[in-house]
Amino acid sequence: MKVKRIVKFNIKKSHIDYKYIKTQLIESKEIYNFANYILRQLYFKNSNKHKYSLNFIEEYPTLKELFLKYIDENKQFSTLFYKIICEFSKLRQYSINLKIVQNIVNKLKNDWTSYWKLLKMKMNKTYDKKINIPRYKKKYNLVEYNNQVISKKKLKLGYIGTDKMKQGIKIANRHKNLDCKCFRIYNNKNDKFVCELIYEKEVIEVEKTDRVASIDIGLENLFTIAFNYNKKGISIKGS
């Protein structure tokens, strides 16, 4: 049976790729926020509860035709929506490639899907907490790199990264030959960058058993072991 495992690495400001990584996280935030802005305006337009604005269409003349088609289409995550976000990324000349742009949009899709699920639960009175539509990212946004953009050359040298990175993030020798599926970089609560390497590992599936042993650390005895089946308990004295 294969299971997913995660290894974490901290990225220091002195790292040779820190500036590049920071740029990627900022670009990811801008792409996420731009895509989310469009979705929020569409949501406000359909809800008739908020003021909405389509003035942003005029800011991108080359995308105007696509925008208007998308508004008429009135579907959140259509093929046309993905195309608009990819064209926006190219227009802004971001360093993030289109595969990563798609990952960012997919993450936004998950956020909106969660909102609709919670809204349905609230309407069915199975959820009573306040819910909000997905908000904008403030400073950075997670960037996920799948195995298609992971540099095999760097991985052999003991680094996880893309071809555009000067060096990549140093990993331990035991991680070189892992079945690496992707890695992602984000900023944590302390505003520090963290890299997570996600890999798959084959593990032996253990058969479930009804037999249980319980260990109790005692005062007079060092410990006592009791069983839930026909076996005499064990008591070990400390002296």
Predicted segments with their positions:
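Nucleic-acid substrate recognition interfaces
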Residues: 1-239
